[in-house]
Amino acid sequence: MAASLCALKGPRHGGANIKVVEMMADLKSHVDDPTDEGQVREYLQAVLDKKALDGLGLIYGMGHAVYSLSDPRAEVLRGFVRDISKEKGLNREMDMYLTVEKVAKELLTARTGKPVAVNVDFYSGFLYDMLDLPKELYTPLFAIARMAGWSAHRMEELGENSKIIRPACKCIEKRRPYVPCLLYTSPSPRD
C-alpha cells in the first residue's frame, strides 16, 4: 500500500485534477469570456501549440489510456458537479467547464484523428474546490478512492498462490564482468 501511495506524484497520475483547476484559472486570466467558444478555442489552441499555460502542450483532464470514447466516471461526476454548481451559484463556472470540454474534444480529435474523451480528473478538481477542500488533499483523495481496488488485487494474488509478477524489461546497458565485493577498489562498483 505504501508503494502505491508513494507512486502518486505529478500531473499524469494523481495530480491531474490540480492541473485542471490551474488551467481553468489561467484560462480565466487570459480571456474576456471563458464561456465563449471562440475565445476558449483560441486559448486551447495556444495551449496545444505550447504558447500558453505551462508550455507542455497538454489540455489537462482530457484523454485516457482505456476510455477513449467516453469515461463513464466523468459522465457520472459531471451530473453531480452540475447539481452542486447550481446549489453554490457557480453556473457560469460550470458553463466554462462544459465549453472547455466541448472545444477541447473538437481540437484534440482534429489533431489526433481519434476521439478523445474528458476524464474524471477534469471535473474532480472543480468538485473538490466547491467543497472547500485544500489542494493538498486532492491526491490523497485520489488514492483513497483506489485503496479498495489495490487491496482486492493484493488479496487475489495471495489467495491464488500466484507467482510474483515481474514486468518484462530488456537491459540496454553494455555488459560488464562480474566483480566480487571483496575485489572492489573504489567506494562504488560503478566508479
Locate the predicted segments by residue.
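Non-transmembrane, aqueous-exposed alpha-helical and coiled segments at domain scale
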Residues: 1-186
